[in-house]
Design a protein with these regions (language model features):
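Walker A/P-loop
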Residues: 112-135
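Conserved Walker A/P-loop ATP-binding site and its immediately adjacent core
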Residues: 130-131, 138-163, 366-371
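Conserved helix-turn-beta segment of the N-terminal RecA-like "Helicase ATP-binding" lobe
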Residues: 152-178, 381-384
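Conserved helicase ATPase core of P-loop NTP-dependent helicases/translocases
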Residues: 181-187, 373, 386-417
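Post-DEXD/H (motif II) to motif III coupling segment of the RecA-like Helicase ATP-binding lobe
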Residues: 226, 231-292
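Conserved interdomain linker/interface between the two RecA-like ATPase lobes of SF2 helicase motors
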Residues: 277-361
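A short beta-strand element within the Helicase C-terminal
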Residues: 423-436, 458-462
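Conserved SF2 helicase motif VI
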Residues: 438-457
Length: 493
């Protein structure tokens, strides 16, 4: 029987001989006039005479070109996932409407057959990586992220750790055959701890050429349920090899929606024609100023003693600034030095008598222990001033959560990881971040937590300990890489 069968990311046509339908073949091939030959063919024919066509190619065109074939659509059979990817929590919410609508696009139409392939095209810096990681978190799918070089793989590795609650052991890099051998030797329980797989195209391509069953066997072994292709305008051949050999959905990411060469661009657009697409121009994004944050840099000194500095340098020797060790030091040894300038600022900026109202504010800290101590001290010192204080963190009991209504509170104290959960806080006018970080991506996402409010100034306060050279260097990096690019004003106190 002659059949056309639709799968999530490819279409299979049975009983096909090469050259029997030149229209389909030419539509998916790049012809080089200089060498008088095809340099790329976006289809495959296996030894059993099955033609494989990209899932994004126009299905109406396929049916019209094979009218004597019966049609079967098996895409819905692959909707369910083999194993849920539990326990991934985002530290941050989408920072703007572009990220919000990008995530809506990735989540929408989950029962729509065309939703198995989605194309997200955002400019560099608009948050493709963040959106992809967020999608994995809420969809609970086990991803394999494909990149074309080690530098990109390292960037993904860092961003996953920046954006989520995961540790290094929860992310696995597939680079070289030895990394695959190591995976296969792991027990099922060991692999269960891996939440993200990042694969180098060259490694997958090399092993696939040695064994045509490699890709499908790898995906089945790891329970992969979503493919994410970064820089999807590159490495076409391997992208198609992966799509032709797997039956889970694909997300294609790129800042470049097309190819510069006209012949290549024609084929590129044919391959992804039916895949739903979203870019910053796809839907109407509400007009708002690109710069609306007023950044205030508030410096203080914790004055560490030589004994602590020696211990801190030792703890920070291997992985850089040890933020947990530093935060414990602030909580247990230098809380007064940390707290008094902060309290003074809060009384002046959050509750200024001249304003006649309280400025809704969020304070970000790194650890729950520091949060609890700060909450207790502020509750005592601000008692009787008609300021409602609430806290939010992962260790709160059910009764504590009920008692702390952050929507109604004037002053909210939370951790960076807890900040990423829940809905946006309406009317938030100020964020005070006490978290040392050198990551411009993390800083940008935290900055984005403060939304534009029409006819109102909003403030982002960078509360920084200048007793540490590393903290000063981090601040300099944040100023140059983030604040100068995104802030309306920058003021140092």
């Amino acid at each position: 029987m002659n059949e056309i069968t639709f799968y999530p990311t490819y279409t299979k046509v049975s009983n096909y001989e090469k050259g029997s339908n030149t229209y389909i073949e030419r539509s998916l091939s790049v012809w080089d006039k200089a060498t008088f030959s095809y340099t790329f063919e976006g289809y495959r024919i296996d030894e059993d005479g099955n033609l494989y066509i990209p899932g994004g190619f126009d299905k109406g065109v396929i049916e019209n070109n094979f009218k004597n074939h019966t049609v079967r659509d098996l895409r819905v059979d692959y909707f369910d996932i083999p194993r849920k990817n539990e326990g991934i929590e985002m530290k941050f919410k989408p920072r703007d409407e572009i990220q919000e609508k990008s995530l809506q696009f990735l989540a929408d139409s989950k029962y729509d057959m065309d939703a198995y392939q989605k194309f997200l095209s955002l400019k560099t810096g608009q948050g493709k990586t963040f959106c992809a990681v967020s999608y994995v978190s809420f969809s609970k799918r086990i991803p394999m992220i494909f990149v074309h070089n080690k530098n990109l793989a390292d960037q993904w590795f860092e961003r996953i750790l920046d954006f989520t609650n995961l540790e290094k052991e929860n992310v696995y890099l597939i680079s070289g055959s030895k990394s695959v051998d190591k995976l296969y030797k792991m027990s099922k329980d060991e692999r269960a701890d891996i939440k993200f797989y990042i694969a180098i195209h060259a490694t997958i391509d090399s092993l696939y050429k040695k064994d045509s069953n490699f890709i499908s066997e790898l995906f089945n072994k790891l329970d992969i349920s979503v493919k994410i292709f970064d820089e999807a305008h590159l490495r076409w051949e391997n992208i198609l090899n992966v799509d032709f050999n797997t039956n889970c959905r694909s997300i294609y990411l790129t800042a470049t929606e097309g190819r510069s060469d006209p012949a290549e661009d024609r084929v590129y657009k044919s391959i992804f024609k039916m895949a739903p697409k979203f870019s910053d121009n796809s839907r109407k994004i509400k007009e708002k100023p690109k710069r609306y944050h007023n950044v205030v840099i508030y410096k203080y000194k914790s004055n560490p003693d030589p004994e602590f500095m020696a211990a801190f340098m030792s703890k920070s020797a291997r992985r850089g600034f040890n933020i947990n060790f530093y935060t414990e030091y602030i909580t247990t040894q230098r809380f007064k030095e940390f707290y008094e300038p902060l309290k003074k600022f809060i009384l002046k900026a959050v509750y200024p008598e001249s304003m006649g109202y309280i400025r809704k504010t969020m304070i970000l800290v790194k650890q729950v222990e520091l949060l609890e101590r700060l909450y207790e001290e502020l509750s005592n010192d601000l008692f009787g001033r008609n300021i409602t204080i609430a806290k939010k963190h992962s260790k709160m009991t059910k009764s504590e959560k009920e008692e702390n209504d952050i929507e109604k509170a004037d002053l909210i104290i939370t951790t960076d990881s807890s900040m990423g959960t829940g809905s946006d806080i309406k009317g938030l006018e100020m964020v005070i971040s006490t978290i040392p970080t050198s990551s411009d991506i993390v800083t940008t996402q935290i900055l984005g937590r403060l939304r534009y409010i029409e006819n109102m100034n909003v403030y982002f306060v960078d509360y920084v300990d200048i007793s540490f050279d590393k903290c000063k260097k981090q601040l300099s990096s944040r100023i140059n890489k983030v604040y100068k690019k995104h802030a309306l004003t920058i003021k140092e106190l």
